[in-house]
């Protein structure tokens, strides 16, 4: 029997391995699009010209009249300006099954009177029409930088801070857009300016060169439509982390942004491991958590098999990234979130009200996290030499810190709880509770969740397999008001028949007690 159970425990990981390592077939190339990339030639030496070209690339990438592949090419051209050999940069990091990059040089000819003396050319020929298209008049639908609204002069910044700092400020912001562009597009603008603040405080990004919100949204839309651009940026991070140590200041700043990009879209997976498994509480022995634990073990093997690209599987849209959705291990995720909201106050703002939330496991996680005994790690007792007296005092302190009120946190965000209320039983426990009107429920939407669950009744929600990562943009207070109104409506539906029945009973009793004349 033990062998049979062992086979079942390893089935998920072995099944995934057999699918991913199935028989080799013929390699059939897919369709590839051609993307034009422009690099600076040796004749472009003036810093003002270089900064002008960089802002020209940025402006073209935001031009909605151009195809997204062209706009993506201009962003690649901008990113390549950070390197002394853009061709080598693209050869190292730009190998992609979707696109083929065609490189054009931009040279400066002092004899030319039009297009500011710039000419687009290759080794064999010059491209006059392309030059006109690239450097011709453009109408920006909105300012590129917030400083343009304040009439700030980029040339002045160039004189004060120098070309590398100005170019670095622009390129770093493009990288910051990637942090939220793929996994949380709804919160892109807010997330961008939150991440940018650290770079503004340390002087990396000057105020006059801060992107406008429209610029951020425009770059984000290009990234979402051009997976080849995202792949290039990820490969750049992988190369920095594994193959180089002599990084420039700009590359070090890119690495800092890369730390925000790592494991983007995998917050639920990582939090389940952190709060659900690594806490090593006794609840993990429950049989209904066993399938989810096996699933998580299989996902860990899959994650590690991806090597240095593992932290970017969601951004790269790896075919396996959907397997990491919490809907694939709902009971363990719900339990982990219960532990998390008790142990980490910041996690109380995390969106837990999802369609696959198992309310019973969510409350169980909170209960075991509050239990003073479960907070003590037996594995470290002997190693640290903790005495029984010390453990007793520690339990006393933990119990006093818990407050002893037994209040449970309610799920935040999402529509899962609202959906469940239509089918949930509402316990009208006491007379005082029954006399409370609907206005009282709406005014204190958290009261019902703050009481311990009575009668052993839990609202349990299951289902959903799609990836729903961090969606913190929805107004939680608005959701709570809607939940309170829904509860009030349900309560009124239950109370009205009871009140009518009570009125009829009182009427009958009154007639029976009135003496006949």
Curated annotation (Swiss-Prot):
Gene: N
Homomultimerization as annotated region, ranges: 440-461
Lineage: Viruses, Riboviria, Orthornavirae, Negarnaviricota, Haploviricotina
GO molecular function term, any single one: RNA binding
Entry note about domains: Ncore is globular and carries regions required for self-assembly and RNA-binding. Ntail is an intrinsically disordered monomeric domain in the C-terminus.
Pfam families cross-referenced by the UniProt entry: Paramyxo_ncap
Name recorded for this polypeptide: Nucleoprotein
Region (Ntail): 405-517
Homology family: Belongs to the paramyxoviruses nucleocapsid family.
Region called Ncore, residue ranges: 1-404
Anything else known: Most abundant protein in the virion. Since the viral RNA genome consists of 15,383 bases,there are 2564 molecules per encapsidated genome.
